Amino acid sequence: MKWDKEKLEGYNPGEIEAKWYDFWEKEGYFHQDPDLSREPYSIVMPPPNVTGQLHMGHALDNTLQDILIRFKRMSGYNVVWIPGTDHAGIATQVKVEEQLAKEEGKTRYDIGREEFLKRVWAWKEKYGNRIEQQVRRLGSSCDWSRKRFTMDDICARAVREVFVALYEKGLIYQGHRITNWCPHCHTALSDIEVDHKDEAGHLWYVKYPVIGEDDYIMIATTRPETIMGDTAVAVNPEDERMKKYIGKKVLVPLVNREVEVIADDYVDIEFGTGAVKITPAHDPNDFEMGERHNLESIMIMNLDGTMNAAAGKEFDGMTLKECRKAVVSDLEKLGLLDHVEELNHAVGHCSRCKTTVEPLSTKQWFVRMKPLAEEALAAVDRGDTKFIPGRFTKIYDHWLENIQDWCISRQLWWGHQIPVWYCDDCGEVSASRTDLTECPHCHSKHIHQDPDVLDTWFSSALWPFSTMGWPDKTPDLQHFFPTSVLVTGYDIIFFWVARMMFATCEFMKEVPFKDVFIHGLVRDSQGRKMSKSLGNGIDPLEVSDMYGADALRFTLVTGNTPGNDMRFYMERVEANRNFANKIWNASKFVIMNLEDYDPEFVPTTDDFTLADRWILTSFNQVVRQVTKGLGSYELGDAAATVYDFTWNSFCDWYIELAKQRLYKSDDKRSRQTAQYVLVRVLTGALALLHPFMPFVTEHLWQHLPHEGESLIVAPWPTVDEALDFAEDAATMNIMMEAVKAIRNMRAEANVPMGKKAPVTLVPADEAMAEVLHTYETYFKTLAFVDEVHILKTTDAKPENAVVTVVPRSEVYLLLKDLIDVEKETARVAKEQEKTRGEIERLEKKLSNKGFTDKAPEAVVAKEKEKLAAYREKAEALNKRMEDLKHL
């Protein structure tokens, strides 16, 4: 039996958190080698950007993972949690480009690719560990010896293998398609790198003359500057107004190009005029329509966002803004602009440089997704991978069923350079797992590698198996793969979860993870998404410094339900810091009463009091509930259960009852039994709390009698059936109801705290009478009672008393000598009058249709809640007044 007997001072989160993280890591508790005799449990950490700083989303994500890992470690599983960071292509490149411009006044082109990449690697080495230190600060017990980086040698080898294998199967190809293009960063962007903002714009109504007729089709467009790239006008085949135009030719304004009116179901009959211009090179939906109808695609913009010669000599070289102004002016002069309407619409911006993103048809590398999506869909359909909550399966299925080919090339320098070489002599295109020095076809030395790099998500898609050393058959891969669970937000199901599924199903022939545990976003107290623009972001490290990482973790988990967003309140962090302090003080009290503790002493069941039997039974029940909650991803419920047990059952009830026996030096066996129960239940509660609040629980556990070296590897509490006393626990609960009834009656009657009240109890049966007689001291200890009278049901009931009925008993509180009845009657009457006034005011307000029809729904609901509360209060005051009349 071990036991740190050093005196426990006041609770200081900062001191203990640094101490215990270093201890765990130094002792190697985060690391486990593959052990075939134990069931594996593995998680790969979603890699934060190497440029990143910890935000509340990271804090939630890592807290949930750490809770699961600590629970499974204590439950005896062979556990591994692999951390790592993502090279974050464009994000990192932009950071270094900004630094280069600021410090040297140069661009990356000025210093060249090789030198620029040296600078990026140097920046990564200098700042890349910052996010790791922040993850540590939260208490994340991941195995840092297995740390991976998406561009380290192991991951780079996996990336090459996957690219070349897909290329050889014809699943990677080069072609022209619409991509999100940033004219400033000069690269294609993934959808997640585009921020959509509502902007005030216009809808221009333009006439397209019908060839050979004195007629025209009116189209509505938000982008008149792209008219010169139009190669068709489309209408819905079901639109009766437009059927007569299908197959006819119209003239595209300004460039006088003859184009056909085509029919396509995509066209929304209700939008604009029901006719739309089709510009395949500059709109993703138009591109798809162009593919269906074999339309010409005309690029009228340069990659820097200016107009080119194909737009017409007049517009060549103009910026988009200049071109729009000129086009609108020319349309007006020609009498082809009918009218303009104001319109708010979403406009995409590059998330890094904030430039407006242009949909452009550019030559890129793509992954052919439909063949790969089939097995990823089937695996979830078979139940090989389950989404928690299950409703997210539909979102996953819908995306994969409607998937488009994936653009994987980026016009950046930082990232995995595409492993494709072009021969300058014979034109051969070669994909290779190793760097080429000559053309495999003609052996020419005149070859060059594709300058583009892969989308960051390409390497991230391989994360579940590349982190374990694939393509080598490593011990980690053989034992820990597939991983047990992926913990992630619902916002990246498309970008990451689905891609990991298809990549792993293709290359590992099994799923990457058995479960996908989805959480929501952390929003501010008003329900808004945290963002730089709103200035409402909260730094988790600042919160940890103020209240402790344990309090932050507990706030994040108790406010969280699977798949749902949560609101973050600083008041809750403070309350959970108070909870940690409560546990600290309770532990301090127990430790102070262990001077004569005998670790060899084991009481018999006869030694246990009613309170002992109740708390031991309650602890068993809590072990069941918390274990079940953690096993079914109801982490918030599990945390709330152990919180309620520790604060209420143990601290507020059991410790108070145990004090009588601890202070009785004449009954050694009773004192020893109380010590035994206190230590057993407190160390057990600390173990249950450990996954949620690892630091404070480790510290307190070390100061209590225990077996083993550290709580992080201590056995998870189990139910001891021999210490289940269901009937006694039920009886104790009745006693507690009676105590609470007395407390409530005292509070309602405004009995001063210093005055003890005589109580009369009338049990419903002999068995209950015996319990009340045996444990009447509980009422004196917990309910501030000086006298307890126990009557038979046939005895006369006391007069001048208020009464409450609890299970199997009636409770009478004699108030006459405790309060000034006249004064209390006047106070209650005044409160009744005030309450009636509030009820009248709210009833009048809610009967006003001007208010109920115009006010926001939430405001009306709030007023209804207030009215219900005041009506409830009025009933309580009426009862109180009746009680006073009988005193």
Residue map of PLM features:
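Extended active-site and interfacial segments that coordinate phosphate-rich ligands
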Residues: 59-67, 217-253, 276-283, 293-300, ...
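Residue patterns forming the tRNA-binding/recognition surfaces of aminoacyl-tRNA synthetases
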Residues: 5, 19, 26-27, 97-216, ...
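Short, solvent-exposed turn/loop segments enriched in Gly/Ser/Thr/Pro and often Arg
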Residues: 36-38, 46-47, 80-93, 147-155, ...
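Auxiliary tRNA-acceptor-end handling modules of aminoacyl-tRNA synthetases
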Residues: 1-9, 80, 222, 367, ...
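Non-catalytic terminal extensions that flank enzyme cores
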Residues: 1-56, 79, 351, 583
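Conserved phosphate/anionic-ligand binding catalytic regions in large, soluble enzymes, centered on
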Residues: 59, 84, 217-235, 350-352, ...
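N-terminal catalytic cores of NTP/NDP-binding nucleotidyl/phosphoryl-transfer enzymes
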Residues: 35-96, 159, 220-221, 226, ...
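Feature 926 captures the class I aminoacyl-tRNA synthetase adenylation module centered on the KMSKS loop
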Residues: 205, 398-458, 462, 506-549, ...
